[in-house]
Amino acid sequence: MVEIGKYNTLKIVKDLDFGVYLDGGDDLEILLPARYVPRNVKPGDEVEVFIYHDNEGRIIATTAKPLAIVGEFQWMECKSVNDMGAFLEWGLMKDLLVPFREQKMPMREGKWYLVYVHLDHVTKRIVASARVDKFLDNVPPVYEFNQEVDLLVADETEIGYKVIINNLHWGLIYHNEIYRRLERGEHLKGYIKEVREDEKIDVSLTRLGYEKVEGIAGIILDALKVQNGFLPVHDKSPAEEIYSLFGCSKKSFKQA
């Protein structure tokens, strides 16, 4: 049985001029149009495809990669609005519908929105919802200290950045622990710093532990880790630039 809205590895059963048919199980054959068929494949080979409904409501396959699959959050741009709802650009030929009931506020063409991709419980079609809170923090946050997690940057607040952890929970990265600007929609790795008594979760972009270097040297080392080993400053950089990044004097920077 195929999973709608997710990646499936399926076997080719027919090769025709307009594409190939894939074995979807239960006597279901799914078309992979010719434009998406990998080179040199033949009946019996397996291909990884994304499964969704086309504009006619038929189950269809593609090797194109959507911005998000069912069960994931992402920032997406609104391409159009009609009497059905708003339609988002998500990397496929068919745009992604956000029904009016799933909009926090009326969506406007050209604006970007944080949405959750899911299957409509009535139509079983893939849709998106901007009412993301109802899809988060629904299970206890069972994380260990320093556990590596996947993060999606949701938005910036006065004290830091709100992030979505493993497509399950809200988390927060504090401004004083970040050494570059984060962008909405950015995916990155993080580490669980603390799950508080109220189940709010603090996250760090660097691994924590007793081996952590203290002082200015530790701050610089953390920044290097976040920036993949490169910083746009050195001992000849202006003192103002060094202070803006690390909150220390040029002399302290050199000593570190």
Report residues per predicted region.
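Single-stranded RNA-binding regions, centering on S1/OB-family and related RNA-binding modules
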Residues: 1-256
